[in-house]
A protein has these predicted regions:
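C-terminal lobe and adjacent flexible extensions of AdoMet/dcAdoMet transferase-like proteins
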Residues: 201-208
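C-terminal alpha-helical "lid/dimerization" subdomain adjacent to the S-adenosyl-L-methionine
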Residues: 8, 25-27, 129, 142-201
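Conserved class I S-adenosyl-L-methionine
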Residues: 1-44, 57-58, 80, 158-164
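A short acidic, Gly/Pro-enriched loop at the edge of an enzyme's catalytic core
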Residues: 100-112
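A short glycine-rich, Lys/Arg-flanked "PGG" loop and its adjoining helix->strand segment in the class I
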Residues: 125-137
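A short SAM/SAH-binding and catalytic strip from SAM-dependent methyltransferases
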Residues: 111-123
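Class I SAM-dependent methyltransferase SAM/SAH-binding core
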Residues: 49-101
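Short beta->alpha hinge that forms the Motif I/post-I loop of the SAM-binding pocket
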Residues: 73-75, 123, 146
Length: 208
């Protein structure tokens, strides 16, 4: 059972941050992700679910024809995403929902996309199980996440700092999604790291 108290705390945290989030993230994201957010959006096909859509920073990068659903636990973030969707003329269905218990039918989407969200979801394995459940056979899982570095000393430093980042920001610095993606039945098609291995992108599929 996932931690509903932590989910409520996350919602309150991001409700407070919603108005300032984009200004704070603009410079950080350019350094952290480069063009990887656009890369992720360009891999999406068909009916696409974006987990923890936040303020909708990916919206401008989706290709025409994508049928988009975005979920987030924070109403404040969703309100900003709605304004961004209107500004870009991007149709999107926005839902207040938890990635650990998706309000979608089995095998109902073609793509599940997550950018910098598995680090804060309390039970990341449950989120991946839910992604697998709602994906159609052959559907795509697209992840861009900050992760534990594959460089030994940096990875160790992340482990040492992680208790503080979790306590004060609900941010897990040293998670390793790739083994969990494989363990949950996905077939990995592409994996790449940047910034000394602390950022990772993954493209995987649910077997047909």
């Amino acid at each position: 059972m996932h931690d509903q108290r932590t989910v409520r705390e996350l919602a309150r945290q991001y409700d407070r941050l919603a108005g300032q989030y984009d200004a704070a993230m603009d410079r950080i994201e350019r350094w952290l992700l480069g063009d990887w957010r656009a890369w992720a959006a360009h891999q999406a096909v068909g009916r696409t679910l974006e987990i923890a859509i936040g303020t909708g920073r990916t919206l401008p990068s989706y290709r025409p024809g994508i049928v988009l659903i975005g979920i987030d636990v924070s109403l404040g973030m969703l309100r900003v995403a709605q304004r961004r969707a209107r500004a870009y003329g991007r149709p999107v269905t926005l839902l207040r929902a938890d990635a650990q218990a998706l309000p979608l039918r089995d095998a109902s989407v073609d793509t599940v996309l997550s950018i910098l969200s598995l680090c804060t979801i309390p039970d990341d394995q449950q989120a991946l199980r839910e992604a697998y459940r709602v994906l159609r056979p052959g559907g795509r899982l697209i992840l861009v996440e900050h992760v534990r570095s594959d460089r030994r000393l940096l990875g160790l430093a992340q482990r040492l700092i992680e208790p503080l980042s979790v306590r004060f920001a609900h941010d897990h610095l040293a998670r390793e999604p790739l083994p969990m993606v494989v363990a949950n039945g996905f077939q990995v098609l592409h994996e790449q790291r940047r910034l000394a291995g602390i950022v990772q992108r993954i493209l995987a599929v649910k077997p047909s």
